[in-house]
Curated annotation (Swiss-Prot):
Record gene name: sfr1
Coiled coil: 177-236
UniProt-listed Pfam families: Mei5
The protein, known as: Swi5-dependent recombination DNA repair protein 1
Keywords: Chromosome partition, Coiled coil, Cytoplasm, DNA damage, DNA repair, Meiosis, Nucleus
Amino acid sequence: MSQTINSELNENATSQCKEDLKVSLSESDLRDSQGQLGIENPPKCNNSGNHSDNLGFIEQSETVHPENEKALTPDLRDTKIHTSLPITTPFSKKRAREAKNILLKPFKSPLRQTASPQVADTNLKPSLAVTNLNSDETNTSSEPVTSPLRTTPNSIKRQKRLFKSPISNCLNPKSDPEITQLLSRRLKLEKEVRNLQEQLITAETARKVEAKNEDKDLQTLIQKWKNAAQQAAEVLFKPMAERIRLAGGVTQSFRIEEGENKGQIQEVRTEFTMSMFLNQFGVPVHLMSFDEENGDWKS
């Protein structure tokens, strides 16, 4: 029995505390709202529902002054501005999207341009032949009339196909055998003219050289070149001949064409001469004025 009584007392105490908390919370909320509006607070009620005038005092209402109201309201200048995150607008997103689309587009060469109607019109020239004019008129009359400002690529291609120059038939060599003969004759004459021009140039240079009378100067220069070449050959010939002599000399092979030993090869050792030296370097002996019989230079 004592346990049941204690439990009932505890439940009554907890319920009474809950009701007191609800009343105090409602009164505090009402007081705050009335204080902001400048209305005096009504008399308080206790837990039993009696007014506070039974206790002998009335709480004075608290009025809110303008200065206190300003102090209560926060100032916008005191608020912190958050600049860590970038401000994104729909316009900036659109620009970023357009830039991304441009980068993803495939490359197109600027040199590949379609033919414009103006260029096609300038390429078209009036035909000189009457027959071609008549044929063009008949072809164009059957086609529908289109505005020149609205020319399509198909119409441009059609105009290019229809146009035929009358001069192209005349220049075609297969059309006329006489033209082929004339062209071949023209090529031969041009070749002869070029040969004659070259001969004329050489004759003019020879005439200029003869007119200057430079033969004496040329003879002196030739003799000067021969003397220098002979001196160089003498300087190079001596050490080379000495080396060949120490190596055993020069062997010359001869094929026997007569007698018992016909067909056999016979080797003969000879001395190294100036003529061999000059021939080995590819210099003609007569150009250096060398006498092979005497083994000396000609004067």
